[in-house]
Amino acid sequence: MCGEYILITPAKNEECNLPEVIECVIRQTKKPVLWIIVDDGSSDKTPDIVDDYCRRNSWMKKITLPPHPRDITYHYSYVCSEGFKYAVDTCNALDFHFDFIALLDADTEIGQDFFEELIEKMNDNQKLGIVSGGIYHRIQDKIVFNGADELLPAGTGRLWRKSCFFETEGYLIEPSPDSISNIKAVLRGWETKQFDTIVAIERRDTRTAEGYWKGYRIDGRTAYYFDKHPLLVLIGFINFSVKSPFYPGFGYLFGYIQGWLGKTEKIGDPEIRDYYRNRRLREYAERVKF
């Protein structure tokens, strides 16, 4: 039975969240053989916190990148990519065996058997290439599921089968790299799944790190960059507009229109563009058939 994994965590100015996240991983019933925390040029106590834990846990390592403004598009994927490269190179150099590759953001709390349960799901179904837990948020003292599609693994609390990770070109330096990874996995015959019974609590919605409007506007520009069919954009607008605080849908639509008016460059990967132009619409159509 496969079971060893490596873990990557990107962190920038996370002194308030990181200690609890680290404790969550230390308490795991199945710990990673190697955990790389990538300090993205933090200006708070994040580096000191990580250094202290690394001194006490030999399977934890830190790498530090130069200071850079917070950026949830290209730079985030670059930070994660650097962590994955370092982790794989370290395992190869030290002859560490691993079967899976995991990503956990520095603001995501997980239960002590989180990764063990995901690994069990993978071992039960060898066709699964990418899985994640369900993403929940604390809203007015309640833990609320974000309602994401069960076939789309989340970006955090995420686990790749090693062979799937490399077959899908690893973690590409692109906006929404988790979405690209999901698509490439499906196009290569892998199954993907988000398990809402395996709980991951995200302390903040990734899109809201710089405010709802800016976060969803970036999502809209990314939709244009991916060459999403206008019907998919309309579905996204409606979905983001029917839930409190309601206005993010307009930010999303505004971002898409910005990309269209500015004739922003689109992604060069033809299979991603074809997926969002054609296959994704067919998937929606299949789901609404009676």
What are these regions (language model features)?
Residues 23-69:
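Acidic donor-binding segment of Leloir-type glycosyltransferases
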Residues 154-169:
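Conserved nucleotide-sugar donor-binding
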Residues 1-27:
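N-proximal low-complexity "stem/linker" segments adjacent to membrane-targeting elements
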Residues 58-98:
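Active-site-proximal specificity loops/subdomain of glycosyltransferases
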Residues 94-109:
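Short beta-strand-to-loop acidic/aromatic patch adjacent to the donor-nucleotide binding site
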Residues 171-237:
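Catalytic donor/gating beta->alpha subdomain of glycosyltransferases that bind UDP-sugars
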Residues 69, 109-145:
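Conserved donor NDP-sugar-binding/catalytic core segment of glycosyltransferases
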